[in-house]
């Protein structure tokens, strides 16, 4: 499957919400409504031995069922109306207790031998909402259930849609996101960042041209 190197339109920190046009990322414990960017988990995954890894998404009928299937690099969350087991593992991995296999997203480029953390978010954005210009401390990927997003980077633009190719962005490059189309965007998002680096940070060294506004 072809992979689009794209990113989510949210700057998130586990301890401090970051301001942006259209909203901020908050811990899910502070949730007051549906729309927004909500940090649902932020956990260490340990040292990654290889230069690439994969994000595995499995759904289960109950939290207990998902927990029974969880491996050492798995996280159980409730988001977007389902119970999820989200795992960082090699290509082709499957949990010990079978659930509904939803997606296997990757490869995610990482630095072999480095320690990593996984930050997971539930994102619900209305068309027209945008991000601040930002970058990540490791690869980012998302699983989109609905909606459309336009990414602008120094290299141009890309469009990510529900039902399309896997969307991933490597750590480092600056980016600016706009929720486009007519449908509310609903997605699960992963930032797999080096433990010594922040998940996200503002990027002041590049200014977007607004290429997504005309789409």
Spell out what each predicted region is.
Residues 2-8:
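Sec-dependent signal peptide recognition
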Residues 8-17:
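Hydrophobic h-region of N-terminal signal peptides that target proteins for export
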Residues 22-24, 30-31, 42, 137-156:
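Glycine- and acidic-residue-biased ligand/ion/polar-headgroup-sensing regions
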Residues 23-97:
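N-terminal accessory interaction module
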Residues 28-32, 53-67, 113-115, 125, ...:
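Short acidic-glycine-tyrosine-enriched beta hairpin
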Residues 38-41, 118-136, 157-162, 166-174, ...:
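Conserved short histidine dyad/triad with adjacent acidic residue
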Residues 71-72, 78-83, 150, 171-198:
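Ligand-binding loop in jelly-roll beta-barrel domains
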Residues 79-84, 88-129, 187:
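Flexible, surface-exposed loop/linker segments and immediately adjacent secondary-structure boundaries
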